[in-house]
UniProtKB/Swiss-Prot annotation:
EC number: 3.5.2.6
Pfam families associated with the record: Transpeptidase
Reactions it catalyzes: a beta-lactam + H2O = a substituted beta-amino acid
Entries under PROSITE patterns matching the protein: BETA_LACTAMASE_D
Enzyme class: hydrolase
Signal peptide: 1-21
Active site: 72 (acyl-ester intermediate)
Protein name: Beta-lactamase OXA-15
Domain of life assignment: Bacteria
């Protein structure tokens, strides 16, 4: 509870301070070393708002503009859709597990919004998708200008196996709107989603993030809030070794953020690892 109150006050201060700063773009080819260390191919976009002269830092600018399936990073906007459409009332509503073994212990249990976000519980979001419907989902996607705004699929979930796609650059643009409560949803819903995204927090910083994995590639997107401003990030990498490559997402991002002092080297005060 203390972390949630601190997070709200922290966000209000940061929003007021950095609403109208200027920004330049800088290619960080030197960040190749972080990808090479983990034998990974991918891109990262980092938007650093801690200074008056804000910076957009990019490794592999070409790939940063290429669209990929959002996979479970889509749970961020999908939760907003579900709240707005009434598919879920609040963070306390319980969704009963149907008893089907889905191969992951975190999925084989009753869920609420917090556990569904933390565990990337697909079956909960499949319930939301069915309740919302494709037509309304398409309207929501266009309304928030999310990637190609295409919720079509011939098989499976449209945010994993379907046509929906988004680039790392577009992920950053979306996250910034959410951070500032500028999306076309109730402010209390945007604040709730941001609360659900908290992964770690220290005395004067908060890390909010979400993983995603489509099978062939994986994401880690989010931001770190500091008193001087926030640092947004969106990474995607190829995952030819599938689950064996998943740890690389967070490892690369954390190494890069620490290299620009956007994450502290010390252990976090509170941690809630997301799959």
């Amino acid at each position: 509870m203390a972390i949630r109150i601190f997070a709200i006050l922290f966000s209000i201060f940061s929003l007021a301070t950095f609403a109208h700063a200027q920004e330049g773009t800088l290619e960080r080819s030197d960040w190749r070393k972080f990808f090479s260390e983990f034998q990974a191919k991918g891109t990262i976009v980092v938007a650093d708002e801690r200074q008056a002269d804000r910076a957009m830092l990019v490794f592999d600018p070409v790939r940063s503009k290429k669209r990929y399936s959002p996979a479970s990073t889509f749970k961020i906007p999908h939760t907003l859709f579900a709240l707005d459409a009434g598919a879920v009332r609040d963070e306390f509503q319980i969704f009963r597990w149907d008893g089907v073994n889905r191969g992951f212990a975190g999925h084989n249990q009753d869920q609420d919004l917090r556990s569904a976000m933390r565990n990337s519980t697909v079956w909960v979001y499949e319930l939301f998708a069915k309740e919302i419907g494709d037509d309304k989902a398409r309207r929501y996607l266009k309304k928030i200008d999310y990637g190609n705004a295409g919720p079509s699929t011939s098989n499976g979930d449209y945010w994993i196996e379907g046509s929906l796609a988004i680039s790392a650059q577009e992920q950053i643009a979306f996250l910034r709107k959410l951070y500032r409560n500028e999306l076309p949803f109730r402010v209390e819903h945007q604040r709730l989603v941001k609360d659900l995204m908290i992964v770690e927090a220290g005395r004067n910083w908060i890390l909010r993030a979400k993983t995603g994995w489509e099978g062939r590639m994986g994401w880690w997107v989010g931001w770190v809030e500091w008193p001087t401003g926030s640092v947004f990030f969106a990474l995607n990498i190829d995952t030819p070794n599938r689950m064996d490559d998943l740890f690389k997402r967070e490892a690369i991002v954390r190494a890069i953020l620490r290299s620009i002092e956007a994450l502290p080297p010390n252990p976090a005060v509170n941690s809630d690892a997301a799959r």
